[in-house]
A protein has these predicted regions:
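Adenosine-phosphate binding glycine-rich loop
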Residues: 45, 49-137
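Rossmann-like adenosine-cofactor binding region
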Residues: 2-71
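Broad hydrophobic/π-residue packing in well-ordered secondary structure
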Residues: 1, 30-31, 99, 116
Length: 137
C-alpha cells in the first residue's frame, strides 16, 4: 500500500490507471523509468508524459488529436496497427510507452495478455473452480 502516488509509480515497469478525475499530474517526469509502459484508461493525470515518452499509442487519432500536446508527441500511432503488424510497437527495452486506452476492449485484452505472459511463470499455482451457474453482482 502506497500513500504517495509518486512512490507507487517510481520504478514500476507497468502503470495502469483507471481514474475518472485527476486535478493535475500524478507524478513528475523523473518518476517514469526507462522502459515503463503507462496505460491510462481514462487519459487523466499523465499529460506530462506526452512530452517525453518515446512512443504514444491510442485507439484512434480522433480520440487524442485534441489533446493539448498532441502535435508534440515524439511518435504516435493507432494501437490496431501494432496488432496488424504495420507498426512494431516497442523496439527497445528502454522506450517509455504511453498507450491511451480511450474505451475499446482491444487494449484491455491485449495488455492483460501481454502482462500475464510476462509474469505467469512467477505466479503461484492457484486453482479455481469454474462457475457453472449464472449470478448477478
Amino acid at each position: 500500500i502506497f500513500e504517495n502516488v509518486e512512490d507507487l509509480i517510481t520504478g514500476a515497469d507497468v502503470v495502469v490507471s483507471c481514474v475518472t478525475v485527476a486535478h493535475g499530474q500524478f507524478a513528475s517526469d523523473t518518476c517514469f523509468k526507462s522502459g515503463v509502459l503507462v496505460v491510462p484508461v481514462h487519459t487523466r493525470g499523465f499529460q506530462n508524459c506526452d512530452l517525453f515518452f518515446d512512443q504514444i499509442f491510442a485507439d484512434d487519432v480522433a480520440h487524442v488529436e485534441g489533446f493539448k500536446y498532441f502535435n508534440q508527441f515524439k511518435q504516435f500511432d493507432e494501437f490496431a496497427r501494432i496488432l496488424l503488424k504495420q507498426n512494431p510497437g516497442r523496439t527497445s527495452d528502454q522506450e517509455r510507452i504511453l498507450a491511451y486506452n480511450i474505451g475499446i476492449a482491444l487494449h484491455d485484452i491485449y495488455f492483460a495478455s501481454q502482462v500475464y505472459d510476462k509474469v505467469k511463470d512467477s505466479l503461484p499455482d492457484i486453482s479455481s473452480d469454474k462457475l457453472s451457474e449464472k449470478f448477478w453482482v
